[in-house]
């Protein structure tokens, strides 16, 4: 009897241990699948457009000289909203950091502020347009309604600044050229069929029969002028408040 009782007790211990291990593994897998992120608003754009200055002004109500950063800067729980502001570096070689972020967290992004320098010659917007195409290719294909974008036209106080409508039109025209060049490149370069189809499909998402237009995107895209140095960012603040 004693030996039988001992055997049964051992079997119960072994069975319980196996069950606990199974539960832990299941919990671990579930945790990974259900991983969530804090909602965020992204600040992006070319170098020297005022991204970090905007983050500083929004979070400290002060204007300070900026330092070039190679890593994203963030401010959690902006204005007590539970939303994190994330400023991404604008250097061409570091733009992949934003792409990686969007590919994993697009559904948690409540809006994207794309900073531009209002004084830049429209003829020199090629790299800016390429950056926007990279962003839109992800946001428009990853989210049912895209991610709303504010084109924040900084340095509007300067004499050479152009109005937001002109900047928006120039970007539309340049983005269309970027899309055409990339499609042509895809047709000329031999690639794996699945990779080529994916790249072409993401570009098709951005085009309609009349070419590229911000108005035809799933997301809303607006352009407002402002000046960080003059602390005139009321329109930008209103847009942010709507997203919180």
From Swiss-Prot:
Q: Which GO terms describe its molecular function?
A: GTP binding; identical protein binding; signal recognition particle binding
Q: What does this protein do?
A: Component of the signal recognition particle (SRP) complex receptor (SR). Ensures, in conjunction with the SRP complex, the correct targeting of the nascent secretory proteins to the endoplasmic reticulum membrane system. May mediate the membrane association of SR.
Q: Where are the transmembrane segments?
A: 7-23
Q: What family does the database annotate? A: Belongs to the SRP receptor beta subunit family.
State if Transmembrane helix is listed as a keyword.
yes
This one is known as: Signal recognition particle receptor subunit beta
Q: Where does GTP bind?
A: 45-53, 66-69, 90, 154-157
Q: Which gene encodes it?
A: SRP102
Work out whether the entry's keyword set contains DNA-binding.
no
UniProt keywords, alphabetically: Endoplasmic reticulum, GTP-binding, Membrane, Nucleotide-binding, Receptor, Transmembrane, Transmembrane helix
Q: What else is known?
A: Present with 8250 molecules/cell in log phase SD medium.
Q: What is its main location?
A: endoplasmic reticulum
Biological process (GO) annotations held by this record are:
protein targeting to ER; SRP-dependent cotranslational protein targeting to membrane, signal sequence recognition
Query: Which GO CC terms are listed, alphabetically?
Result: endoplasmic reticulum membrane; membrane; signal recognition particle receptor complex
């Amino acid at each position: 009897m004693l030996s039988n009782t001992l055997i049964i007790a051992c079997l119960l211990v072994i069975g319980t241990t196996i069950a606990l291990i199974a539960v832990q593994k299941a919990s671990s897998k579930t945790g990974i699948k259900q991983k969530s992120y804090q909602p965020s608003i992204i600040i992006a754009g070319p170098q020297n457009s005022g991204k970090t200055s905007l983050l500083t002004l929004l979070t400290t109500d002060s204007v300070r000289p900026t330092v070039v950063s190679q890593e994203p800067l963030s401010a959690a729980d902006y204005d007590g909203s539970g939303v994190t502001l994330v400023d991404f570096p604008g250097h061409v070689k570091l733009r992949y950091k934003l792409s990686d972020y969007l590919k994993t967290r697009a559904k948690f992004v409540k809006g994207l502020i794309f900073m531009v320098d209002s004084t830049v010659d429209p003829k020199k917007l090629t790299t800016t347009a390429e950056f926007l195409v990279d962003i839109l290719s992800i946001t428009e294909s990853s989210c049912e309604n895209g991610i709303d974008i504010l084109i924040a036209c900084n340095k509007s106080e300067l004499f050479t600044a152009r109005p937001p409508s002109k900047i928006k039109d120039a970007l539309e025209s340049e983005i269309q050229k970027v899309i055409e060049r990339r499609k042509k490149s895809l047709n000329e370069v031999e690639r794996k069929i699945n990779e080529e189809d994916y790249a072409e499909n993401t570009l098709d998402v951005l085009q309609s029969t009349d070419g590229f237009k911000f108005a035809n995107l799933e997301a809303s895209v607006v352009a407002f002028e402002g000046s960080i140095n003059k602390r005139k960012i009321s329109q930008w603040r209103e847009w942010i408040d709507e997203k919180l």
